[in-house]
Amino acid sequence: MNRDPYPPPGDRQTSGQAGRWSGGWAGRQKPQYNPEDGRYYNHGTGQQPPPGGGGRFSRDPREYGWNAGPGGGPGYPPPGMQPPAPEKQLRQTIKRTVKLVLPALLILFLVEYLFAFAVSFGISAYITQASWSFTDYPPDTYFGIPYGLYDLLTSYLPVVVGEAAALLFLRARTGLRLKDFFAKPEVLSREPGVEGGCREPERAPLSGGKLALWVVFASLAGIGVSMIGQIFAMVELNFLYEIGFPYYSPDFSTGGYTLLDTILCNLYICVLGPVLEELIFRGFMLRALQRHGSAFAVIFTSVMFMLFHMNLVQLFTPLLTGMFLALLAVKTRSLIPSICCHILNNTLSTVLSYIPFESDFAAGMATLAQIAVFILIFACFWMLWGRQFLPLMRDRDPAMKLSGKLGAAFTAWPSVTFILIYIGMIIYSTLMTWLSYYYY
């Protein structure tokens, strides 16, 4: 397509000459502004308008449609309505994309808490109608309901229902299919292959056992990234404790649970939860936002993944892990590696939580050894494959800097609403923790 990004200097249409261009455009078909990418195109050669046109001219200054009249000539804004600058148009486009996918997180929390409230209300009604006395309740129960079953109904099941609602919303809004995310991972080997006439020799894609080993290696490296986040979390916990403001990390222990309840809870933590979260964040959201640049999509979805955990301590771990998982998804064009990494990370944490230690010192030394081993694995992975990931974080878009894209995304109303919800939840949980520590 013959493209003229902008008309020549002095050929801008004036407010008094709507539909006319002076100078060098005489005798040629006039260039048309395309709101899809904020550029002008010359269709004097008979080329069709770019996608997104069609329809009649809109008086909305944010939209400039194509003229449906004879000859297929371009439509022009009325006097005084000049097309917005490309950067402004791109900012609006980014906000529209965020408004397309981010309400899924708001729906997730709304459905989750409404479902949890309904279940809690039903349990309260059941307890009220029960005729037992306090001494009749068996141990390890909540008014006769086993602790494991109570947690499943009020904590885990609402999250599953909320995440399922978010996935249905994203599926309807984006039009993407679940099978689109489970393609065979595309990974290039480190060894150069035959010369391909390019600047660098072609690298053969991995397949079979080599590809499976690479996915395992990347998953172990992802655990190393999580361990780096845990170091920051431990520093944060110690700092809060030193200033007299203790804050507890989430407790996923299953003490007092029946065997069936333990299996069901761990099934969500280790398998179902990672799969649903990867589909939401590294699947639908990342794929929709990636049209504005991989670096932008990776950073924005990782920050949302951090806020999604609604915990003051879980800041660096989900942020760093989310960035690594997003890079895996972008690099391999598949969710299989990121899902495997997420499952392995949660499974390892769950298994280690069941290992008894004779003292706190032994537990601390085991934790330090675990952190050192997996950080070493990550360092090895990055030395071998890091060069293939670094280009993904370089944003070379001439229309807008990465900071401008992130600013547009975080100022969209779904982002602001979600951040305010996060702040409110942190304030509430912090006050409850502080009151329970000092007054109970």
Model-flagged regions — what are they?
Residues 132, 248-252, 288-292:
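Short acidic/polar alpha-helix capping motifs at helix-coil junctions
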Residues 223, 227, 261-440:
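Transmembrane helix-loop-helix hairpins at the membrane interface
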Residues 176, 187-189, 241-245, 289-295, ...:
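Juxtamembrane helix-boundary/capping and inter-helix hinge elements in multi-pass membrane proteins
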Residues 140-142, 246, 277, 320:
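N-terminal start-of-chain detector that recognizes signal peptides
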Residues 1-215, 349-440:
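N-terminal, membrane-interfacial amphipathic/helix-forming hydrophobic leader that caps
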Residues 232-273, 297:
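His/Asp/Glu-rich metal-coordinating catalytic cores
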Residues 99-114, 118, 122, 153, ...:
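Hydrophobic, lipid-facing residues on alpha-helical transmembrane segments of integral membrane proteins
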